[in-house]
Amino acid sequence: MITKTSKNATRLKRHARVRAKLSGTAERPRLNVFRSNKNIYAQVIDDVNGVTLVSASTLDKDLKIENSSDAAAATKVGELVAKRAVEKGISNVVFDRGGYLYHGRVKALAEAAREAGLKF
């Protein structure tokens, strides 16, 4: 019988393949996106030192969101992570979509982060 691999297993393979080529530095950290069924998370990471510089998610108390799993929530998370990064003096980042397609919630987060001042 033919077995079908799960979408998440395929995503993890894709993410590992991309991460082998992509790394964040102190000057240009990595904006990482993780998407679950209910929430979306974004982190700005310095891979050289292994430090998370800034993070935001739909679980933050700063965001008052009714539906945390839609594109509007992802837009608010993108704005918040960009605002926090700019406050820390970070303007250039490398976008890591986490193996997800650049579509829907991931795209909404990325575009909101760009409009709020991050360059990638």
Curated annotation (Swiss-Prot):
Any one of the GO CC terms: cytosolic large ribosomal subunit
Domain of life: Bacteria
Keyword terms: Ribonucleoprotein, Ribosomal protein, RNA-binding, rRNA-binding
Keyword presence, RNA-binding: yes
Gene3D superfamilies assigned: 3.30.420.100
Subunit and interaction comment: Part of the 50S ribosomal subunit; part of the 5S rRNA/L5/L18/L25 subcomplex. Contacts the 5S and 23S rRNAs.
Stated name of the protein: Large ribosomal subunit protein uL18
Name of the encoding gene: rplR
